[in-house]
């Protein structure tokens, strides 16, 4: 199963050393069973996106580990890929960028010709051949149709997908330089959120009870984190409800709305997927 990790400390810039590498169940450790690609998306001081990615696992891609340890941003988006569609290439590796936004996805969407038809000219922004990047292009199209309103456009796009296309899962994170959105749909995979206050509680013991991790960069900065699973033993991790859209604004205010209360019109089970796609969606 692909792993998603997003964090925002907006409007403050922070280092993400603790979360990307040192947690007991960190992305680097997870990637040992997700060998198709890793990527890290951040934002420069001028607000422009910076995405660094490799079609390799993090345990074989030491640069990812080094860069993750030293990156500074207001929002972060990291992804460890186990491919469901698309070859192991840089264009197919998450995260993706469009119109100053960064996006990553875990799940499977089928009937890509139908999706391409709906994208029309927005298909030109897709550089690879994954369902994920196509979904991002559809979201971009709907954001434009809603005058740049990300929440409205994202909601409109995923409602269209839920109604029109076969779906196994759509878990996603989308970030700008100072905002974050996350969606879990349907109940197929988990997606957790943690609101972290600044202070001494930023010292934790990992799930095995033997490794203690500290983050000096976050001791005086509150953060909101979204991840495919709890990344430490903090009891305040909460799973998003199926169909729930999480929005964290520029001041770390959180809005949670169930935008897809119904199951997909064309749900897929593991047995409906080809062998590669099915393997990509298993917990590892």
Positions of the model-derived regions?
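Extreme N-terminus nucleophile/cap motif
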Residues: 1-57, 245, 253-268, 272-273, ...
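Conserved beta-strand-loop-short alpha-helix elements that form
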Residues: 2, 101-111
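Short acidic-glycine loop/turn motifs at beta-strand connectors
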Residues: 8-11, 43-48, 99, 175-179, ...
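Structured interaction and signal-relay segments at domain junctions
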Residues: 37-74, 78, 184-188
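Short acidic (Asp/Glu) patches
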Residues: 54-66, 78-100, 117-121
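Long, charge-dense
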Residues: 118-142
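A conserved acidic, glycine/proline-rich C-terminal tail/linker
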Residues: 200-245
């Amino acid at each position: 199963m692909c792993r998603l990790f997003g964090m925002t400390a907006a409007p403050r810039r922070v280092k993400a050393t603790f979360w990307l590498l040192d947690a007991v169940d960190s992305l680097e450790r997870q990637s040992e069973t997700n060998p198709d690609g890793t990527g890290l998306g951040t934002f420069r001081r001028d607000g422009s996106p910076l995405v660094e990615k490799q079609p390799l696992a993090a345990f074989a891609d030491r640069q990812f580990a080094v860069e993750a340890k030293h990156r500074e941003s207001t929002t972060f988006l990291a992804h460890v890929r186990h491919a469901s569609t698309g070859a192991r290439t840089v264009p197919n590796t998450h995260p993706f960028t469009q119109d100053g936004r960064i996006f990553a996805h875990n799940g499977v969407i089928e009937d890509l010709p139908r999706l391409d038809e709906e994208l029309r000219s927005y298909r030109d922004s897709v550089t690879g051949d994954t369902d994920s990047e196509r979904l991002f292009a559809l979201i971009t199209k709907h954001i434009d149709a809603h005058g740049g309103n990300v929440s409205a456009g994202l909601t409109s796009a995923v409602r269209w997908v839920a109604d029109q296309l076969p779906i196994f899962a759509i878990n996603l994170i989308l970030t700008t330089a100072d905002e974050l959105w996350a969606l879990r749909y349907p109940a197929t995979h988990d997606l957790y959120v943690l609101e972290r206050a600044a202070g001494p509680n930023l010292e934790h013991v990992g799930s095995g009870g033997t490794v203690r991790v500290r983050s000096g960069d976050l001791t005086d900065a509150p953060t909101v984190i979204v991840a495919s699973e709890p990344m430490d033993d903090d009891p305040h991790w909460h799973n998003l409800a199926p169909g729930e859209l999480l929005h964290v604004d520029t001041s770390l205010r959180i809005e949670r709305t169930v935008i897809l209360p119904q199951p997909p019109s064309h749900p897929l089970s593991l047995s409906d997927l080809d062998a590669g796609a099915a393997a990509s969606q298993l917990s590892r």
